[in-house]
Amino acid sequence: MDAVQELERRIVELEIQSALQEDVIAGLNAMVAELRQTLDLQQAQLRLLYQKMQDRNPDAQEPYSLRDEIPPHY
């Protein structure tokens, strides 16, 4: 195999690696975007829950406890 053919083979291998890496990066980017949306939703839910807890007892000096809540079936 002469030097030109060896260089062509190496270039083809590098192009294949580059294409595979681009695919992996695109997949990871999509996953990060999905996780970001999930995190944003969870943060909004947490803020809403915190606000509801504050609205129930804004003057409370003690932290909120689930033990103070009586389930509806009792």
From Swiss-Prot:
Transmembrane segments: none annotated. This is Protein SlyX homolog. HAMAP family: SlyX (MF_00715). The gene is slyX. Pfam families: SlyX. Belongs to the SlyX family. PANTHER family: PROTEIN SLYX (PTHR36508:SF1).
